[in-house]
Amino acid sequence: MKKTATQSSPATRVERDTMGELAVPATAYYGVQTARAIVNFPISSLRFPRGMIRAMGLIKRAAATVNQSLGLLDKKAADAIKQAATEVVEGTLDAEFPVDIFQTGSGTSTNMNTNEVISNRATELLGGARGSKLVHPNDHVNLGQSSNDVIPTAIHIAAGEMMQQQLIPALTCLQKALARKAREFDKIVKIGRTHLQDATPVRLGQEFGGYARQIELGIQRVRHAQEALSEVALGGTAVGTGLNCHPKFSARVLAIVSKETGCTFKEAKNHFEAQSAQDSLVEASGELKTIAVSLMKIANDIRWLGSGPRCGLGEINLPETQPGSSIMPGKVNPVIAESVTMVCAQVIGNDVTVTVGGQAANFELIVMLPVMAYNLLQSIELLSTASTNFAVKCIDGIKANEERCRSLIEESLAMCTALAPEIGYEAAAKLAKDAYKSGKTVRQMAKEQKVLSEKRLTELLDPWRMTEPGGPVGSAGG
């Protein structure tokens, strides 16, 4: 006789929820609601990352501690929940979180997935059978909580902790690498470029100093994002009113989580804002997008400066990391910088998703939390790994091609800018055009036309002098 969905077999057990019975894998720690979510959402291969699962475990563990201290949960159940939640925090039970990212917009399936895993593991620790609900997923593990406040809180915790432990150290590594190159290249003068056209000289160290400052500002942006994420929804329960939650619950839970993560989290000043909108996630994603824009600019500049080896700009030499072509022998490409640009494109796209998610709030709840979480946390991870890789495998190994820098400066028609304050803008422009038509340098043409004494030309056409403020005052071009 064919088995129905509710009949058990040696490989399954039958669990019941408010919608009826369903077979669950016998060895699974998750339960019936997770099993329903697996059936309902066969959408993608995307799952919540480790940081989010860890954050869920942190909340549930702290909740058990606080509920016990408030006299709402007996010590036996609380201790079992805390031990099971610790296994979630440490990643031992990661395989028990199979729910797709594209699920219920509140993330209820993932909250119940967490509740069921901790419930069944805690029940097992107390000598009960999985599925027997000796420790109940709702009454005990989810006590004083709702998916509507737990999921947004977990997103904030995961993002804040990942920023602190991964992104800020990675950006600091990159900023220091760029700053070292700025000092190393400070004496090397090269041609500047605006609109991809020759401009007045600049020191290679000044360019790298600009890059270092961009990343320094990026670190500040991450800290601003952390501050925006510090207010969390926990304590608002279903719609922000705090129904079925002890008034001291949220503050005590967040004090524990803050201590364990090294990040500051506090109860939202207004729970209706914290649950009906996620402007803080949109803000944080926007900060990450800005960092991606900075990295895109830096990586593209590095690619251009290292283009060649014989027919490009060639002002710097990039580390050779791998063969660049399957058909052109000896070709080496700027693959690390290219990798960074693709990461930046992904982060910018992720920001669009987070923005759309932020718009998807109706009344008391935002209903795109899982996809907002996935994209935000992916952006943090990608920027972290790409920044460290960029620093170690590219920036640290860059060498300046000093001879190439010198030769390009002398060939530049923009050198005439230094003469404009003394001979006038129009005369300097004519000099540049004459030099271009004749194939001569500005220096050669200026000597030939005797626009100034040779001594004065030598002074004014000193490339180093052009990289510092001062000298005759006049229009510097546009």
Feature names for model-found ranges:
Residues 1-478:
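Conserved, well-structured ligand/cofactor-binding cores
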